[in-house]
């Protein structure tokens, strides 16, 4: 604008200096008149600190337009003091005159304004005649501050080390994305041992996970993330945990791929500032950002099309203003090259005649130069597919189409030796299956596996010559094959389908291979350059079902769920496998392999299509069927906060798998019991750190084992069979565990959702016959509420061997029958025909009474009981009546033996009285015992021993009980007696009298009983 004013001033001075001869010039200037105001002015508030102004040039200007000026000031403030102006000089593409120039739309963005403030705006054009007429003032108000909030900080990023120079980074958005959707993320890093500030990677990352390359080997790093929306950047996230890149000898990795500038910055929370560092850092985005999935989001900040219907639009962007809004660039239409995948999904990359510098690919795709056909192609990112890469593809068994590939971290600890097993199905005679090497072009060290004319070729080079090992048999197209590669130094081996191994040897003396590139599966982005090394420049066509490297099976799903870091144009081999599945009775279909499925049958159904109904007795779990069962916690979570104990009897068929698992959705709390490498592991977390207890000895597979795990506060105990008990402690200061999920048995519904430190990797394979939680038995028939593909184990109890309503009690590989009253024998097959006058009890026997005349004599303010008994066991219950279920400080009355002594106990609601007569009353002889209570006072007399007395604490005097009366034992005795007694009487009872004169016929008056036989001699 100063330039324009200077030109006009010099013209006027020149005219005046010419004197009278200049009159015609001055007259000509006056005749031309002032330029009119710009037309069709539109104001629009963009954000809190900027507005846009659009206009058309004045109609029929008398002379060419030399520029525009926008005048703006706050409404309500003295205009002469506050008015500001912004000059718009003419650009190369700015029309200045012409018949159609008035149709052009101009746009400018005015920034650095106050939030929520009303501005008065007008503008004028400049020409040779000077400033034109001002437009009529218009008003515009910037958006209020609360509508222009930046995002909150993302969650703490999770980092895993990929190699000596690479890490994989993932994160989740923060609590709020601010007032507008997140546009991109920025990543920062620091080296705690060297740096005093954070270095920013100057890239706009439109993902929520990435692989960062080019880091220093054997170096500590921390990473942080910021989220950016149109209103600004979030604070820095909580820094990641400190990780250390691998040493070069541990893991080869190259600094490959595009490199990007870095920026060392000092933020609001930094104490120091350093100059930019010349760090060679690159990144690879591996997962699309959900907020920008649709359409082409490749942003161009150079221009912005005005949102007007007129096709002729000129636009500019003011660089300092943060209000610029990016637009979608339109890519040229590619040459149509179509190929349909196995299930009809278009997968052939689009071919362009232009180079990647000029090609604009759609969102979720990237450009690669095509050296074979010329031009370039847009490839879909891993997990994306379809014509415009807009379809989500869930990848479990990757499908390749000749131009696809998947990348994994470079081969680790493999420079001297490695073993790789691959299960695949080929659809074409040629194609690259595996490649990993020193560089992307096959020069120097490498290994590869390729299908060449239906033969498999395993090649490797230690640096001085290539070994080529060719399978003796050819593969069958469309059939599944398993190939194993093994190399140790110069020597290599290839084995196809368990056939005769073929061996070979590389040339020269070098025996180690440096691996720096990713491990490529199904092809490689540089396959064109690999033909000399690998024998083919074609990608693999077909499916891969399993890949195992050095004994560890790789999860082929995209990271972070699996190990696949990136890829191109990958499909899912099992897609559509369930379309024609017929799972009935509530079963659901899922792919079990690349070309087969299983039905997830609900509890009580089994079979290929869940067609077979059955009664579950002894559950059998199978990893191949994704089995699991679930049961709710018997009581509220508060009952298990500080103490829990599980007793489990199980038979493992595999060295790994989850036995029990439960967790809290709102915290880090969990507990898990796993088979891990043949050992039992008990893991638990109170919210501040995980405790891990591991059995000292491995378990014998195919045999029954007894397990007991307990936790008191943050202390745990693990006991397996007769092994030495293992004790351990959880980390941190928290001491309680709250689990609001069900208890999962034998597996879980989703292995991706388990707690990070739970150790849960796969389902349990084997049988579980008993689970007891805090003395409460978890019954398969009644307590298992849901689950899938749980079948019956091969166990005698499955065949219901107990007759006449007897219940089968499994005892590892054997069993016992609990017989109802009136039956006896190994299988309860024998009816008791004679009346039982003196019942015999076996430790798991009992008699139950619910007659009101009996019950009222064992309650109230007074009680009087007499019994004659004999026993050979030191411990056993004689009599019990209490609330059902028992609660803390519940009323009860009991009589029994503990370590040979007789104990009379009762609680009236204010505390327990326990009166004991010491002795050895388990001598097998008959003894008489009398227990009397009058209010709080109690007395017990045994044989001719002197009486022992006692008194209950507190003020309560009445015995208020709602439960039945049990003699000789009871159901779940440890649970219902709060562990006062662990077993019933082993012996006989001949007399039972209440209230001194109310004689009870022990068997005849009983309403129920178990395992009652006739005692021998009186």
Curated annotation (Swiss-Prot):
- Composition bias (Acidic residues) maps to 265-274
Q: Where is this region: Disordered?
A: 228-274
**Annotated Pfam families:** EGF, EGF_Pikachurin, fn3, Laminin_G_1, Laminin_G_2
Composition bias type Polar residues, residue spans? 231-244
Main subcellular location of this protein, as a coarse class: secreted
Where it sits in the cell: the answer is: Secreted, Extracellular space, Extracellular matrix; Synaptic cleft; Presynaptic active zone
One cellular component term (GO) for this entry is: presynaptic active zone
Q: Which residues form the Laminin G-like domain?
A: 395-573, 618-797, 836-1015
Q: How is it modified after translation?
A: O-glycosylated; contains chondroitin sulfate and heparan sulfate.
Q: Which CDD domains does the UniProt record give? A: EGF_CA, FN3, LamG
Question: For this protein, what is any one GO molecular function term?
Answer: calcium ion binding
| Signal peptide residues on this chain, from the entry's feature table | 1-23
Q: Which InterPro entries match?
A: ConA-like_dom_sf, EGF-like_Ca-bd_dom, EGF-like_dom, EGF_Pikachurin, FN3_dom, FN3_sf, Ig-like_fold, Laminin_G
Q: List the disulfide bonds.
A: 356-367, 361-378, 380-389, 543-573, 578-589, 583-599, 601-610, 797-808, 802-817, 819-828, 988-1015
Quaternary data: Interacts with DAG1 alpha-dystroglycan. Interacts with GPR158 and GPR179; transsynaptic interaction is required for synaptic organization of photoreceptor cells.
What's the protein called, per UniProt?
Answer: Pikachurin
Organism, as annotated: Bos taurus
